[in-house]
């Protein structure tokens, strides 16, 4: 299926590009998330009429993400989780836990889908570098310090 991208999508393209994607990806992700529209003649004409407005919205989103990224870059988040004597956690620290911790620390707008854990969930006590993708162009490094709670 061919779609018109309404915003920059990682590993796919930029605003206004007509790209070919799998039908399921378009129907289940891109179109419902308002990241793309089906590429028909009418949709292309409508897009060209709204192009300036969409580019302005994209620039505002990028500026907001960069401002949040400057505040968030190098931040150290402390997460307390129950742990055994050997330093292994009972349970794990997920990207949802990290996003929640960042939101409570005052970084509004961080979603769990933006938190990238390179080695999967955190299952031990320690310090772990992670990345937060606030925008397709804004990637921020954050350190998560997992502390063990003893009963």
UniProtKB/Swiss-Prot annotation:
For this UniProt record, the keywords arranged alphabetically read as follows: Ribonucleoprotein, Ribosomal protein, RNA-binding, rRNA-binding
Q: Which GO terms describe its molecular function?
A: rRNA binding; structural constituent of ribosome
Q: Check the record and name the Pfam families matching this protein.
A: Ribosomal_L9_C (PF03948), Ribosomal_L9_N (PF01281)
- Determine if Iron-sulfur is one of this entry's keywords: no
Q: Which GO terms describe its biological process?
A: translation
**What is the purpose of this protein?**
Binds to the 23S rRNA.
> Which named protein is this?
Large ribosomal subunit protein bL9
Q: What is the species of this protein?
A: Bordetella avium (strain 197N)
């Amino acid at each position: 299926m061919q779609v018109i991208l309404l915003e920059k999508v990682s590993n796919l393209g930029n605003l206004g590009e007509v790209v070919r994607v799998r039908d399921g990806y378009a129907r289940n992700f891109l179109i419902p998330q308002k990241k793309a529209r089906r590429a028909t003649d009418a949709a292309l004409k409508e897009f060209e009429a709204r192009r300036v407005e969409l580019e302005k919205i994209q620039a505002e989103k990028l500026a907001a993400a960069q401002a949040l990224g400057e505040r968030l870059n190098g931040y150290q988040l402390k997460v307390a989780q129950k742990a055994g004597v050997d330093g292994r956690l009972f349970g794990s620290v997920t990207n949802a836990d990290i996003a929640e911790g960042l939101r409570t620390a005052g970084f509004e707008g961080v979603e769990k889908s933006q938190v990238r854990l390179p080695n999967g969930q955190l299952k031990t006590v320690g310090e772990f570098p992670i990345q937060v993708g606030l925008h397709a162009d804004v990637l921020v490094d954050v350190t998560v310090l997992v502390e063990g709670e003893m009963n």
